[in-house]
Amino acid sequence: VAFAPPRELENPFIETTREGFHTALDISAYSLVAMAKRAQPLMQAHGGSILTLTYMASERVMPKYNVMAVAKAALECSVRYLAFEMGEHNIRVNAISAGPLNTLAARGVSGFTSFREQMGSAAPLRRNIDQSEVGDTALFLCSHLARAITGEIMFVDAGYNIMGA
């Protein structure tokens, strides 16, 4: 779950309102903590996996992502704290940081298509990803094969995140 009021993404970051900042963090970061709190009693007998989605703008500036980048950074930190605290119940918490996906919503973002093309050509695998690759990663992280993975941010972006600026 992620959201920031559109004006907070359109205006310069320094113009972020207190209300917009709060909304973005509440919906995009705190929602994971609230969900994990409610899921823990249901999961602690048999363990399990909690996943969330993030974006590399949590680590580097992506123009017009603004307060959502701050929220994603908070989300990633929450993943680590939840992984630490829930680990004793064999509950793993991880995040998938996906590259730009060609969705209807994404295509509505100004400049998305050219940005996606640039990322695909700059990625080590020289391509973009698709939804099935994110789904496959989620399936892996929820499976027994990932039983020793927790507190991690798993990049699914054809390697783009390893590239310099």
Question: What residues fall within each predicted segment?
Answer:
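Short C-terminal tail/terminal secondary-structure segment
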Residues: 138-139, 150-165
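A glycine/serine/threonine-rich, flexible loop-to-helix segment
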Residues: 88, 98-123, 133, 163-165
